[in-house]
Curated annotation (Swiss-Prot):
Pfam families (UniProt xref): Rhodanese, UPF0176_N
Protein name, UniProt field: tRNA uridine(34) hydroxylase
Record InterPro entries: Rhodanese-like_dom (IPR001763), Rhodanese-like_dom_sf (IPR036873), TrhO (IPR020936), TRHO_N (IPR040503)
Organism from which the protein derives: Hahella chejuensis (strain KCTC 2396)
Domain Rhodanese: start-end pairs: 123-217
SMART domains, per database record: RHOD (SM00450)
EC class name: oxidoreductase
Residue ranges, compositional bias (Basic residues): 307-323
Length: 331
């Protein structure tokens, strides 16, 4: 088994003291060398983190010791490397940003559909299947016959619904996302608008890929994930996509053959959208990344900070020894 556990977790629950949870949560993560980002808001917790089995178990035990989070939803996958550089806990207005006041998945939400029942639902000709993710995510993988709303952010989803969906016309609507959290809000939003039969994939794409054998699957392509793996395949292993360090878009092997691709600087998605100053900064950053790699170090994050401190200490010791040598030679 791979050395590191990657855990995507969330829970919609009233956390009136969410600000006070930040410091102890960050302390637990740092103590157990768990990296990644967790978001805290009055409406709950959300994020993806990674660490050793022992570290993740310690974090989950701490979270679940709070009765409000005892049944939080989480999904695990594994990799040889931790796909994050830093450890962060952020305070937010929403744990997933839709930007619509009054939407509360704790009060009303769509019907959860288990992964093993999903295929039967979405092959029903009366069901409208919608991917609630961003366009760049949909481009690298989706369920067969799913509609792409072509949104750049989740904030745009309500406008898509208002312009394209009608409760009187669309009697059955099924939606899905990466891990389930966006669908908690999107189905709650549709229910508030008067849509009656609204369904969503419990646990999201990641749970479907885990539970449904590939030979029975209706999933096409890979699944984008918000960490350094970029995407995962049907076995939840790191996929074939890389990421442009300039625009953060997923890039394929074909993209990297483009004349517009320059590692760490530009890709076919962004080459005509960046300034000369940005290109120079991206090129300088890529040089620093390659320099760090040549030393066997990370270029950012806590490990990079440790490496810098170590080099500084070594230089200081070297200077001290040099001055001692000069002093002894003069005596």
């Amino acid at each position: 088994m791979s050395q590191y556990v990657i855990c995507a977790l969330y829970k919609f629950v009233a956390l009136d003291n969410f600000e006070a949870l930040r410091a102890p949560l960050l302390e637990v993560m740092e103590k157990n060398e768990v990296k990644g980002t967790l978001l805290l808001a009055r409406e709950g917790v959300n994020g993806t983190v990674s660490g050793t089995r022992e570290g993740m178990d310690a974090l989950l035990a701490w979270l679940k010791s709070d009765p409000r989070l005892a049944d939080l939803s989480y999904k695990e996958s594994y990799d040889e490397n931790i796909p994050f550089y830093r450890t962060k806990v952020k305070l937010k207005k929403e744990i997933v940003t839709m930007g619509v006041e009054g939407i509360d998945p704790k009060r009303v939400v769509g019907t959860y559909v288990k992964p093993q029942d999903w295929n039967a639902l979405i092959t029903d000709p009366e069901v409208l299947l919608i991917d609630t993710r961003n366009d760049y995510e949909v481009q690298i993988g989706k369920f067969k016959n799913a509609i792409n709303p072509n949104t750049e952010t989740f904030r745009e989803f309500p406008d898509y619904v208002k312009s394209n969906l009608d409760p009187a016309k669309h009697k059955k609507v099924a939606m899905y996302c990466t891990g389930g959290i966006r669908c908690e809000k999107s189905t709650a939003y549709l229910k508030e608008l008067g849509f009656e039969d609204v369904y969503h994939l419990e646990g999201g794409i990641l749970k479907y890929l885990e539970d449904v054998p590939q030979e029975e699957s209706t999933w096409e392509g890979e699944c984008f994930v918000f960490d350094n793996r970029v995407a995962v395949d049907h076995s939840l292993n790191k996929g074939s996509y890389d990421q442009c360090h300039a625009c953060r878009m997923p890039i394929s092997a074909e993209d990297m053959q483009s004349e517009h691709y320059k590692k760490g600087v530009s890709c076919p998605h962004c080459y005509d959208k960046v300034s000369e100053d940005q290109l120079r900064r991206f090129a300088a950053r890529e040089q620093q990344i390659e320099l760090a790699k040549s030393r066997g170090e990370e270029h950012i994050g806590s490990e990079a900070a440790k490496a810098i401190k170590k080099r500084q200490a070594e230089k200081k010791l070297k200077r001290k020894n040099y001055h001692q040598h000069l002093t002894q030679g003069a005596e």
